[in-house]
Amino acid sequence: MTLQQPDAIEVRGARVHNLKDIDIDIPLGKLVGIAGVSGSGKSSLALGVLYAEGSRRYLEALSTYTRRRLTQAEHAQVDEVLHVPAALALHQRPSVPGVRSTFGTMTELNNSLRLLFSRCAHHVCPHCGARVEPSLNVAAGLSLTCPSCGREFYAPDAESLAFNSGGACPTCGGTGVMREVDEASLVPDESKTINEGAVLPWGTLMWDLMKQVAGEMGVRTDVPFNQLTAHERDIVFHGPAVKKHILYVPKNGEGATPLDFTYYNAVYTVENALAKVKDDKGLKRVARFLREGPCRDCGGTRLSEVARQPQVCGINLAQAAAMTLGEAIEWVRGVPATLPTEMQPMAADICDSFLSTARRLVDLGLDYLALDRAGATLSTGERQRVQLARVVRNRSTGVLYVLDEPSIGLHPANVDGLVGVMRDLVADGNTVVVVDHDTRVLTEADYLVEMGPVAGAGGGNVIAAGSVDEVERAQASRIAPFLRTDPKRVRPQVADDEMFDQGHIRMATGAIHTVKPLKVDIPRGRLVAVTGVSGSGKTTLVLETLIPALKAQAAGERLPSHVRWVDAEGIARANLIDATPIGANVRSTVATYADIHDELRRAFARTPEAKAAGYKAGAFSYNTGALRCPTCDGTGSISLDVQFLPDVEIVCPACRGSRYAEAASHIHREGKDGSLLTLPQLMDMSVDEALDATVGLKKVQTRLQTLHDLGLGYLTLGEPTPALSGGEAQRLKLASEMGRVQDDAVFVFDEPTIGLHPLDVQVLLAVFDGLVAKGATVIVIEHDLDLIRNADYVIDMGPGGGDAGGQIVCAGTPDDIAACAKSITGRYL
């Protein structure tokens, strides 16, 4: 008798987050797409059920001793999940790597390069400096003999060539950058006297009395700084640390105090403050006086002089790492043929390991990135594709891969490569579940599951499931109308001759990263999309150039060194609205972030019951108030420490997640229909429900209406903000900006359609319209064709990525871009 192999993961009774006790079969060995509007339960099904159960069961198969050293998942809220394979998840937002991470280290390409330069290089004799021919002795762990001086030495191993260990530059510690005091920033206004605060660090980083000490040093403190002699200026910037006797008079003029005080010159004041920095806040205070540049010893390569000595084909490791991936592939292919015959098989093995890793990265459109590019400067989409390439390289089988929006940051031209990589995973015998909104990804799925019909409490149901054709025919489907249609325009088009009616924002830049020197002209008071393939320079142009330049001009500070000039008269604010999570812990909720909770606390403190009990507004705070739950301290949950098992996070049994003590349920406020509501009940309502329940509270109503208009009506007031999706976080950050006059503001959104269903994109466009109607200039970095089609003006970067990009290919209306033969974006519009 032959046992029939299971052909599907059977999910029964799933209740994670907003899932409504759903039953669904997910085909095994297929590419499965999960669609649905934001907040409909897609990630709850994919990550909260499939991944959570797949990874938990795999870990449970390990020994107790091993499990104690791993972060473990708790049981998902589901009756049964059958036939689920071991699972791996690629999350929507991989963490930003630290300062020591580069594209080469993240992809492990550096490992192959270091091995190549250790085993196959011409090494330098440490005794006489002569070069020694490549030899198999290095791989065998034997010494090399110098042909010039005859002495023996050992070649560096691969670890000795790593900038994170033995090969690090001693000056910068392997980071490649040095922070130095920028003397020009110490005295920005030389028309002021020292007494008037000309020397900024003495006023912001040091006691004000340093002005008096400078006077005792022989510096005139009552004349404009630009009239000081060269000797006096030298004392201000570089004077010696000597003790001086001063009579300190406090600002209130009471009681002069004699003091002996050591003189700290302006440069040392900054250096001393930098040495004492303990957190980002402290660094921010000092950063304005610092200039960051390449390390003077290693030239930014991160490597020590010894690590830069071995050469392969005439170049060293630093020069190889400076190549783009595309260039490095060509170079690596040619290496084995240049070596002695007996070394070629070993070199070929090392080179093959590099090339097999590189091939996946090229498929995902990352060939434009230099291997030494700092990991922190990679975009979200680039980091996610690096993560995906690492997974595919393993060639494992029988695994469930859950991908959360892998199309983030992916230009339409790169979608085919992404689909190809997912198909390779399926071909290796794996199951791929992909949560995405990109219809070009969804239409490639073998099986499609659509969640909905709406977000939040009204969602959590399977409204369609089957092949793409079957979902298209499903009456209840909300994605069906978008699956095979071209992007449509829903906003009125601004006439060409009216585009710049409200003014210009102009800027000229020098070269930076892959961006060539260029001039850009942006219409004010319009919705402007910055487009282009990955690596074309969009992020560099907008986030690293335009925003810092506008902020510097508004603050009257020096422009970034690569910005030649900027003309943006009347712009006082440049706001980046990104998708990073809001708040660091569960104490931050939608109500507290949107400034609704304080108003609600005051409203409940005015009730007769609160007055009778002696409760003021502060008592209703779930963080510090008298009415917070004493069991969970107002977090709504408690963590149980179970030895040998993972800590179990459970809803607080005392307050049942409301965060409040029992006494809070005795304080009522009358609602619209005469019903009595408590604050815990209100916090458990959605924004839309609370709109009806808070009639009469004008400020609360205004803020709730704003959240509704932002498409966030389904969020509950007590929902922790760190749990919000990227798109939800972005829109919530806008809440405080809506309704204000914005003609002095520029709002920049980095891929605001992340996590948005095509229907949600239409809501987002309405939000942008609201900002533009108030005079704001809205700039979006975007790949989503629906949003690009609806922009007033498009600036298309390219034509390619990396060195093949960095230029403005064309600028104009979406129709102009579509008609531009050189624009890759235009082909898809």
Residue ranges: model-predicted function:
Residues 1-829:
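Conserved phosphate-binding elements of NTP-dependent enzyme cores
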